[in-house]
Regions:
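Acidic catalytic cores of enzymes that act on phosphate-bearing nucleotides/polynucleotides
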Residues: 40-53
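C-terminal catalytic subdomain
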Residues: 53-164
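Short acidic, glycine/serine/threonine-rich loops at helix termini
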Residues: 36-42, 92-95
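Generic structural signal for well-ordered, non-membrane alpha-helical segments
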Residues: 3-11, 59-63, 196-199, 203
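Extended hydrophobic packing segments that form well-structured cores
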Residues: 121-217
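Flexible, glycine/charged-enriched surface loops at secondary-structure junctions
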Residues: 3, 22, 29, 77-85, ...
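A charged, amphipathic alpha-helical module
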Residues: 1-40
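Predominant activation on well-ordered alpha-helical scaffold segments within soluble catalytic domains
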Residues: 11-15, 64-72, 203-207
């Protein structure tokens, strides 16, 4: 109960920072200190902030948080930072996952539950399969030390949760394996963001307006 209370207090702390300092995007150093020094997981609190469309990215990923914030502004729907953790060439799919910071509105019906971190065994995390639907995938990247936008379309398929936490099986259309391989070869950071819906052209327009090179996959 003590660890759970600490996790909930993180949510209230982030809320207060948002209200007091007018902060719309957070990059949280979620490990190891959150576990070893404070004693809880920050995934659940960040998920609740993401639900409010206040970007909360884990692993202190500043550009990841900015990426989510841009999607929030363009789409007025929650965005989520994920790892690309698996690619199945035969199935033409990849898996998007993170420990448990997806907002509940992204959950497949009747699938959400609360859980503890798979490694650290501390609360609070969300646990569910991502709901099926079309998505826009985006990253503000500095790969090769050059600022750029990466944007692509995808679709979350109706599949079971692949891992503990929050995950979804995603198709990027034809040649998903090749597209993911090209991303990795380009040196893209290991996080991408997505939101449900199609803001592909909006991202391209923003890149043009800001004069930031925009690459479509």
């Amino acid at each position: 109960q003590k660890e759970l209370n600490k996790s909930i207090s993180l949510f209230h702390g982030l809320e207060k920072l948002h209200e007091k300092e007018k902060i719309d995007a957070f990059a949280v150093r979620c490990w190891p200190e959150m576990f070893t020094e404070y004693g809880c997981a920050s995934c659940g609190p960040m998920a609740m902030m993401n639900e409010k469309k206040i970007s909360a990215a884990c692993e202190a990923d500043v550009l990841g948080s900015l990426s989510c914030n841009i999607l929030n502004q363009l789409n007025n729907k929650p965005a989520l930072l994920v790892d690309i953790v698996d690619v199945d060439e035969r199935d033409n799919t990849t898996v998007f996952w993170h420990c448990g910071l997806a907002p509940l509105s992204m959950a497949e019906k009747n699938s959400p539950s609360a859980t503890v971190h798979s490694n650290r065994r501390k609360p609070l995390l969300h646990n569910f399969a991502l709901k099926a639907g079309k998505i826009t995938i985006f990253r503000v990247s500095k790969s090769e030390n050059k600022l750029k936008f990466i944007v692509m379309k995808g679709k979350v398929l109706k599949r079971k949760n692949s891992f503990s936490g929050t995950s979804g099986v995603v198709s990027l259309g034809p040649n998903t394996f090749k597209k993911i391989n090209n991303l990795f070869l380009s040196g893209l950071e290991h996080h991408v963001c997505f939101t449900y819906g199609d803001v592909f052209e909006d991202v391209k327009s923003l890149g043009k307006q800001l004069r930031i090179p925009t690459y479509t996959i």
